[in-house]
């Protein structure tokens, strides 16, 4: 699918991609959605009690674990050496999800409670312009080209696997003896 960004920041990003494509240089654009990994996940905000459970029905975001960014990059280098060189590749996991779903799963891993669910209309009043723009678009992207056509096998196919990895790497075992 061709992107149809609504936000100015997303439109600038697409214009930058198009400029690179028109440069005549041998390029490959890796589109990365929400990036997370050890020491950069919802586990920190839950553990420090800074998380907000925002409810915006129908709102989902695609994400990717840093292990899969590295793995997909290496895989695409091998594909290029074999003559497969798509110009634009989405690097994302298989399960776009609402932010509240990640927080709920992260809280289960940590054995922590979460704040009450807050409707987006209320939460938006306290958001920065950058945060607000992030929530204005659905950010669901497909990894079909990467996984089905180019044969990359995800290390973390969904946020469950990715957050379990973060949990183990970050040493949260001390907080709960039976992680999910």
What function would you assign to each model-found segment?
Residues 104, 124-153:
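Conserved C-terminal active-site "lid" loop/helix of NAD(P)H-dependent oxidoreductases
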Residues 46-56, 111-116:
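A short C-terminal helix-loop "cap" of Rossmann-like NAD(P)-dependent dehydrogenase/epimerase domains
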Residues 70-72, 76-131, 176-180:
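Mid/C-terminal beta-alpha module of Rossmann-like enzyme folds, strongest
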Residues 29, 35-45, 54-77:
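Substrate-positioning beta->alpha
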Residues 157-180:
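Amphipathic terminal alpha-helices
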Residues 1-11:
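Active-site "gating" loop of Rossmann-like NAD(P)-dependent oxidoreductase/epimerase domains
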Residues 61-64, 97, 141, 157:
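Residue-level signal for the nucleotide or nucleotide-sugar donor/cofactor binding architecture
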Residues 15-39:
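Conserved beta-loop-beta element that borders a ligand/cofactor-binding pocket
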């Amino acid at each position: 699918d061709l992107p149809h960004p609504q936000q100015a920041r997303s439109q600038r990003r697409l214009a930058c991609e198009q400029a690179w494509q028109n440069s005549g240089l041998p390029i490959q654009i890796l589109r990365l959605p929400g990036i997370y990994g050890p020491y950069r996940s919802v586990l920190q905000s839950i553990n420090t009690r800074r998380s907000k459970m925002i409810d915006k029905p129908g709102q989902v975001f695609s994400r990717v674990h840093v292990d899969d960014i590295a793995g997909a990059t290496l895989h695409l280098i091998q594909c290029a050496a074999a003559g497969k060189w798509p110009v634009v590749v989405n690097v994302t996991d298989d399960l776009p999800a609402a932010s509240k779903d990640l927080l709920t799963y992260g809280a289960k891993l940590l054995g922590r409670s979460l704040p009450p669910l807050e409707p987006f209309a209320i939460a938006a009043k306290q958001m920065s312009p950058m945060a607000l723009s992030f929530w204005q678009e659905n950010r669901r992207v497909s990894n079909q080209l990467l996984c089905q056509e180019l044969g990359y096998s995800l290390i973390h196919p969904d946020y469950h696997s990715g957050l379990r990895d973060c949990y183990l790497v970050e040493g949260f075992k001390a907080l709960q003896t039976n992680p999910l």
